[in-house]
Amino acid sequence: MASIVPRFRCLNAPPLRQTSRNILAIPTATSRSFATEIDVSKPTPIVKRRPTYFKDKINAVPSFSEFVGLPEKAFTPEDALELRTAMVGPPGKKRQITRLPEWLKTPIPDNSNYKKIKKDLRGLNLHTVCEEARCPNISDCWGGSDKSAATATIMLMGDTCTRGCRFCSVKTSKAPPPLDPHEPEHTAEALSRWGLGYVVLTSVDRDDLADGGARHFAETIMKIKQKKSSILVEALTGDYGGDLEMVKLVAESGLDVYAHNMETTEELTPFVRDRRAKYRQSLKVLEAAKKAKPSLITKTSIMLGLGETEEALWQALRDLREVDVDVVTFGQYMRPTKRHMKVEEYVTPEVFEIWRQRALDLGFLYCASGPLVRSSYKAGEAFIENVLKKRKGVTILSDEATGMDKAIV
């Protein structure tokens, strides 16, 4: 028979409340310890935080006192190159870019005259090559405090070109929108509203049209002259696919300056311009314009920094003089987007001045040459304007208006 444990044995244990009091009454002098004793003779190693990139940069250079006491050393070519380049892009995909030289940096346009011209253009649904081609001189040409000094090169026949030159940022399409029949009238209205004395008209190439847009161009010039006959008009045209009759039509429409850009040397033309634009064809356009109206000033522009050679540039200037071109401009090619040709060289202002003098020595009437000079740069226009007025028997207002000082940027 199983033994029975007496239940009353638990009555001999102290009450639970009393037990808790006894525990609380135990002196606290005793200290808790880990089950495994720690050897305090060995110091605990300190884990250093990974230094940041900023701290690395700070620690890599001398202190201020050390820096002041360092002897001056000339920059090595490697140091100079490092200052001209920068690494951009996300981690793992960084690439090296070349910073723009100081002489190519321009202010951001933001003043009342710039805003007014832009508002007028939008209201009349007009386009400018200044915006479409991302011209660096837009703050200078649009932002002048003197209204008569402001220049905006109106781009006719829309903002979409049928050609795709590798240096130009204008939109391209095989089938651009149809021409706006009201554009000639709107253009004449805008130019008369601004009160300018000298205007520049250009256009996209329209190979989709039978006449290349020559009649539209000529109509616009005639409308401008009807509104204000004293306005001097420069037309920067395409090559009309080599149709010299269309060149003659525009040249005889009443303009004062016929411009067509060569863009580069003969050897680089196939790599820089659209395959339909040919070096010899452009020379024939300038020659045909001069023959159609000998009193016209003919003008062209060449970009530097594309990898051209000195001898090729000399040959281009000689070719232009053979067809009696009066004015040439030199400017720095600046890559508009990553889709376009890379800049081979940033040409210094001193080299631009050398080519300006060489052009004048060859017999050109005028040459504007500088990193920021473009084919319709206002410094050149001021000089041409006074040449035209002089031919018409108008007194030149001032020596400053010739723009000779502004020609070299």
From Swiss-Prot:
Primary enzyme class: transferase
InterPro entries linked: Aldolase_TIM (IPR013785), Elp3/MiaA/NifB-like_rSAM (IPR006638), LIAS_N (IPR031691), Lipoyl_synth (IPR003698), rSAM (IPR007197)
Compartments (UniProt record): Mitochondrion
Cofactor annotation: [4Fe-4S] cluster
Record EC number: 2.8.1.8
Gene Ontology BP term (one): lipoate biosynthetic process
Disulfide bonds: none
Binding site for [4Fe-4S] cluster 2: 161, 165, 168
Extent of the signal sequence: none
A GO cellular component entry from the record: mitochondrion
One Gene Ontology MF term: lipoate synthase activity
Pathway membership: Protein modification; protein lipoylation via endogenous pathway; protein N(6)-(lipoyl)lysine from octanoyl-[acyl-carrier-protein]: step 2/2
Lineage top rank: taxon: Eukaryota
Keywords of the record: 4Fe-4S, Iron, Iron-sulfur, Metal-binding, Mitochondrion, S-adenosyl-L-methionine, Transferase, Transit peptide
Binding positions for [4Fe-4S] cluster 1 per the UniProt entry: 130, 135, 141, 376
Domain Radical SAM core: 144-365
Transit peptide start and end: 1-34
Keyword S-adenosyl-L-methionine: yes
Main location: mitochondrion
Pfam family, one: Radical_SAM
Family: Belongs to the radical SAM superfamily. Lipoyl synthase family.
Listed HAMAP family: Lipoyl_synth
Protein name: Lipoyl synthase, mitochondrial
Species annotation: Sclerotinia sclerotiorum (strain ATCC 18683 / 1980 / Ss-1)
